[in-house]
Structure formats: C-alpha cells, structure tokens
Amino acid sequence: MKKRLVTLLAGLLTVLSMGFGLAQFSDVPAGHWAKEAVEALAAKGIILGFPDGTFRGNENLTRYQAALLIYRLLQQIEEELKTQGTSPTMEALAPEDLEAMIAELKAQPMPEPGMDQAALKDLMDRVEAASIAADTALAQAQQLAERLDALAQDVEGVKGDLAGLRSQVEANADAIQALNELAVLLNQDVLSLQDRVTALEKMVSGGQELPDLEQFATKEDVAAVQEFAAALRSDLVGLSEKVSKLEGTVGDLSGKVATLQRNAFTISGSLSLNYSVYRAWGPDASAAGPGTANTFDIDRLFSSKFSTGDGNGNGSVGDEADLGKNTEGVTNATLSVSFSTGKLDAASDPGKLNSYPGLVQFSLRAKLTNPGKYDPSTGAPTYPINLTLDEFSSTLAVAKDQTLSFSFGRSVRSKFTEYVFDNDYNSRGHGFVATYKPGLLGATLTGVYGSKGANNGDFTYFRGARLALSPVEGIALGGSFVQEGLDANQGTTSASFPAPTTVYGVDASVKLGPVGLAGEYFNSDAAPNANGYYVKADVALGSISVAGNYRNIGAGVTGANMLSGDATSTLDQGGWGGVDSSGNVINGAPFRSNRQGFGVSASAGLGPITVKGYYDSSTVLANETITNSYGAFNYSANNQLVAYGGQADLAFGGFTLSGFYRIAQLNGSTTRYILTEKPAEAVYASEYGAKLAHDGASKDALVPKLNFTAAYTQKYDNATSGFTTQDIAVYGSYELALGPLTLKPMGRYHTQDAAAASTSSDYTTVKYGVAASIALDLPFKPSLSGEYYARSTQVTSANSGSSATGTISESKYAVGLKLGEFLFKNSSVEAKYASYTGSGLNAPILLGVADAASSTTSDYLYNNAVSSVGSNRGSVTGWYFTWTYWDLTFAYVEADVNNNGNQTHGQAFKISYTVKF
C-alpha cells in the first residue's frame, strides 16, 4: 500500500512539475518521456483532459486544477484501502497498529530520493528553455505595450482634433435629433391612441358593454389631454418649420463657405526701410560718390547684414564684394506687395447664362522704391508703381471629363520636351498657354503664344502646339511644333518677310513591368545639323539592373536653335544641362550635342556586395573646344571617344569598401580625361584604386556622426603614357555634443606624387579645423561660437611642368558672442571678430574663389591654389556688431584688408526695418 501511494504521488508530482496539460491522446507525442505517466493517470480517471480530447501539456496548472487532481487521487487511494478492508482514515487505526506500521516503515530500506537523474536533467533543461522563451516574450510584450501606448497617445490626439471638428456639427445635430425623438414619441402616442379607439369601436359595434371609463379618466381629463395634444401638435409644426428653415440656412451657409474658400484672396508682401553709410580709404578703396562699387569681401570672416549674397548664382558668396566703397547716407524704402487668389467663380456676360465655379486664378506683384516726400501743392515727386501680372490662370469644365485651362502673364512658363521649347525654368516672354483635355485616349493638347523678351523692340513672337496621348497605362506618345520670328513685318521696313525658326519633334515612352523604353526625334531649321534623336532602354529585375542608349545629337542642337531658354549653361556644348545655386535642375536633356554613339551600364547586388560596370562609345560630329574645371578639350570631327570601367562595393557596419578600374580613350589611345555623353561638367577618367568610407548618418554606423574616407588612386598621366601619378587622400569630420557644448572637428590629408616626366606637380596638403558653439541657460540667454581652420600645401616638385614650388597657406579664425535676450524680450545683440590670412595665393586676397573652409573634400579654404604657388598674399580682419529688436536692426562693421602690403580700411553702418505681411 505504501509503495503504491509513493508511486501515485511521484507520478502526480511529475505531471505537476511540467505544468498540467500534456496531451492525453492526440497531442502527446509518441515516445515522450512522460507519456506513460499521462496514460496511467488518465486510465485511473485522475486526469480527464479537455473536452476537445487534448491534454495541453505546455499550459500552466491552475490552483483549481491542482485541487481537482489531488481530490481525485485521494478518492482513488480511499477506494483501494476500502477494497483491502482497511479504514480509509488514520483515525480508525488502533495505537498498537500505528506503532507496528511505524516499526515496519523504519525496518524497510530507504528508497532512492527523487526521480531518475536523466529525467530530472531533461526536465530542468525544458524548464530553463521555457523560462528564457517566457522572458523574451515578456520583453517583446513590454516593447509592444510601449508602442501601443505611443500609438494610443497619437490616436487620442487625433480623436481630440476630430472632436473639435465635430463640435459645431454635433451642436446642431443634437438639437435636430431631439426634435426627431420628440416627433417619434408623439407618433407613438398617436398610434397608441388610434389602437385604443379602434378597440373601443369594436366593442361598441359588437354590442359589448363598455367598461366604466370614469374609473380611468373623467371628461375633464380627456379634454385636458386633447388640449395638450393639440398644443404639442402646434409646437411640433412650428418646430418642423424652424428645422426646415434651419436646414435651408445651413445649406446656404455651406454653399457660401465653399464659394469663399474657392474665391480666397491673399495679400502678402514686405516693407523694407534701409539707411546705410559706407566709408573706405586706402589703395583698394573706391572713389567717393554715388554709384561706386565695393571692392573686397567680408563673407569669409562672418555672416552679416552687409552681405551682397550670391549675386552671380555660382553657389559662393565669398567672391562678391561687400565693403570698400564711399557713399553718403542713403535711405532706401521698398514696398513689395503680392496679390494672389484661389480659384475664383465666374459667370458669362452678358446674360450670365452660364456659371463657372473655380474658373479663374491669378497673382499680381507691385513694387515701389524710394517714394520720396510728397508735396500736395505740386503733386511732386511722383514715382511709378511697378505692377506685374505674374500669372492669370483658369480651368473650365466644358463637358464631362473635359477641361480647358489657360494662363497668361509675365511669369508664364511652358515646356514641350527637354530639347524642344524647354522654358519651364526661364520664362521665354510674355504670353499665354492654353491646355485642353478632351477626356479621350488620355490626350492633352497644349498651345502657346507670346512675345519673346516682352516689349524689348525685337518684335519677335513664338507660337506652338503639342499633342500628348496616353491611350493605356504605361504608354505615352507626343508631338510638338513651335515657331518663332517676326510677326507680319513689324520691326522692319523690308518688303521681304524673314522666315521664322521652326522646331518640331515626336517622342514616345513605354513602361511594361520591369522594362522601360523611351525615345525622341527633334529638328530645327535654324542651322545645319540642328536635329537629333535618341532611344533609351532599361530593365530592372530585383537587384539586377541594365540600361542602354543610342543617340545622334547634331552639332547644331543648341538652346537658341531649339527655342529652349532653359539651355543656358555655358560649360557644355549646346548649353544643355546644369543646375542653379539651389540645386534645381535647369534643363534635363539626357545627352550632349555634337555626338553620335551608344552606351550601356549594369549593376547587380548580392547581399552586401554590389558590382557595377559601364561602356560608352561616341563619335564627335564637328570640331569643338570646351573648357571647364578639368581643362581644355579640343576635339576634331570624327574623333572617337570610348570609356569603360567597373567597380565593386562591399558594405558592412556603416562602412563601404570599394575597388574600381576606369579607362578613357581618345582615338583608341588611353588619356586622362574625356568628356562624358551627358550635358554637364563631367568627365570619364583613366585610373584605378580603392576607397574605404564610413557614413556617420547610416543607421548601421559604427560611430554615429563620424564621416571618414581613405582613398588610394593611381592616375593615368598623358606625359608618361602610364598610370604613374599616385594620389592618396584621407579626410573626415565628426560632430560631438557635450551637454550644451557642440564640437565639429574636421581634417584632411592629401598628397599627389607624379613621375619626373610628368607635367603635374608633387604636392601635399594638410588641412584641419574645428567649429564650436555653446548655448547657456543663464540670464540674457548668452551663446558663444568660435571656429578655426587652416591648411598648408607644400608644392615640392614641378617635375617637367611649370608649377612654382613652395608653400601655400590659408588660415581663418572667428569668435562670436550673442545675447538672446538683451535688456528686454525680443531684443538681441551680437558681436563677432574674425581674421583670414593667406599666402602663395593665385589671386588677390580682395575676393575669394569658393567657400570651402570647412569642406573635407577640398584642399583649400577660399583660394584654390593647390598645385602651384601663387604670388599673392595678405589678410582680411574685422569686427561686426548688430542689435536686433523684432524686425528693426542696427548693424556696424569695420574691416581691414592687406592686399600684398597695401592697407585698405572699410566701414559701414546700416539701419534696416522689414515688415512682412
């Protein structure tokens, strides 16, 4: 009996240790180490399993389930004891029997403690694995809970916004709902009364004796109820009328609001008042008097209210003069106002038979400068207001799915294709553009007409049309025609009428899944060979992409000949390509003119590895000479240009390791550079090497905010006809925040080592610097800033060239203090001091060449002398003070420039007030 009890308890504990619910039949795996125990307990009725026939061995055991198991076990034990004729309780035993049982137990050998060790170890492993899984699930659940909390907050915010939007609607809706509910109740009462009347009528018609109605209500009660019902009906009718009026009013107001939104009128602009005085003395100062110009730049020292900005649009402010002129105190006032509308409604006139919602939209600009003091007795002086109509546009829905829109004004722009009549960046002149969409075959018909350059006396007009079709998704077709020339015989007394310039073209594109195909043909009669065509194709399948092209762009394809004002870049043949100082594309023509050829490129990726390759071959159609920052390129007709190369990249942990090999050939011979087929300042080069780069902005960055590059390049040298020029560059930058202090150090090392027979020089540049700023949470809200940058270039050998050897140096330091709250709110004061020094420069220090002081990819600060020592030296030093209260600014600056020993001093004072509205 005792052994049976121990066996049953051991089996129960085994099941409990694994958690109740190992599968009874269907979900208990065959060969499971606890399968025998489960089946034994199930056979004895201790374990019954779940109603679906499963045991669920991986679920936890509840206290209720444990109580039930123990209860069934005790019942089983009692039954077996009773079967053996033994009392089921220990109380039924006599003391001598208990003593005998105790003696018998003591005499028996001790059983081995615990369970089988292998089973226990397996049990512990399973428990540990379950614990780890539970911990992981708990952590994931906590993260999910945090995300759900954040999402709940966002949802609550959105609910708040929606509640605010619904508040006005609900205010009226509640009142209307209450009226509706009252009407429903009244209708129910009426129906109930009708039912009662019908029942009474049946009783009367059937001869039944009516009940004593007096016990329910007297006549006076009935009369009172009737009077109340009549009053309610009257109120209901009145309320219904009010609701109807309210609904009509709401609908009318909604229509008026929609009309006001469509007809929104916006006025914006600015009023600028400036008083300024400029003084300068020294050899490089301008002569005194009105109309004199500044002579030297101070943007290299610090930003200021005296900066003339990027006047030439080359992306640099250091090459624009800010000080050095002499002018008396001058006050300038400029009022600029812009009027713009939403889409205004319109009606036909006369008769107003048809109305056109959202028909018209336009904008106006007005500018008035230096109005002067007005004398009412003479009406002088008077100043004209320059009123400019930027653009007037409208869209008319002429029929279902058909629209007609047109626009006109000074700023109207239009574009047919990249080669034909591309004038969407630079307006070609005053005129109008009309666009009709008939709603058939995805068609768009565009017409243009205008005066080139507005009223400039040349009497030249342009007119053109374009039809574009998109019959199905992914397929587009287009045709363009445009002319420009004299209109009638205006501007000439000649009896003969000169022929206009005519340009036309057709284009098409197809996109079917991963395959894309596009092409264009264009022609102009403005010059010989002013025509061309190209075809482009590309395929992308996963990480593999292939692109190819064939082009034949004539030498006469220029911006002027194609009536494309956006083709204004002077760097490239035909003036195609280029971007503005803000990075906006001026013209996106895909290929350079004066070329016939083809090209192909491909790339493939496999995990962290990417492989790229290209091949391009072209023939020069006519003699050309192009000069850019890479040098002068003199090509003759029928010259053959070939370029090919490959590159492999390996990305890991924010790093990219690259290896490359590139070849550029002219007439079959390798050369250092050839121009690419693209209309931009770009070249194909002959070189090979490797580069390791770390991107601090990458999510996988090993060190966030650390940008680092190490590059080795072996360059081809035309003088030696080999890869004899070695180039090594290591550079980087880092941004470090230490509480309120921010540090941005940078550094660059660059060396070039050419062969003795090369015309290139040997030089080494070391460049370094740091910018620091700190904002303190103290009275007056002070903040400090400072920066220091320097570079030293050693030109050690001219080799077989003409470069001058020696040292080129540049350095710059600046400090600044700003009080964000000076004396009172919205008042701030700032003081700066800075100095820039250079020697061995290739241009006078009066102006810079480019702004590259903090650039890690440039060898210089502001003067681009690198491979040869120049003869210029000097310095620019100055200080600047400004006080600002709202839009009122007082600014003062003094600066000294030492230009090759010639000392010039400049100073300026300015008061400015600008209001924007």
Swiss-Prot record:
Instruction: Spell out the subcellular localization from the entry.
Output: Cell outer membrane
Membrane listed as a keyword = yes
* Signal peptide segment: 1-23
What residues does the SLH domain cover? 24-84
Identify the InterPro entries for this entry. Cell_Envelope_Struct_Comp, SLH_dom, SlpA_C
Keywords, A to Z, come to: Cell outer membrane, Ion transport, Membrane, Porin, Signal, Transmembrane, Transmembrane beta strand, Transport
Specify the domain of life of the species encoding this protein: Bacteria
Entry annotated with the keyword Transmembrane: yes
PROSITE patterns noted in UniProt: SLH
Q: Which GO terms describe its cellular component?
A: cell outer membrane; pore complex
Report the protein's function.
Plays an important role in the structural organization and integrity of the cell envelope, bridging the outer membrane to the peptidoglyan layer. Appears to be a nonselective channel.
Q: How does it assemble?
A: Homotrimer.
Q: What is known of its domains?
A: Exhibits a tripartite organization, with its C-terminal part forming a homotrimeric 28-stranded OM beta-barrel (OMBB), its central part forming a long trimeric coiled coil that can traverse the large periplasmic space, and the extreme N-terminal part forming an SLH domain trimer that can interact with the PG layer.
Full protein name: Outer membrane protein SlpA
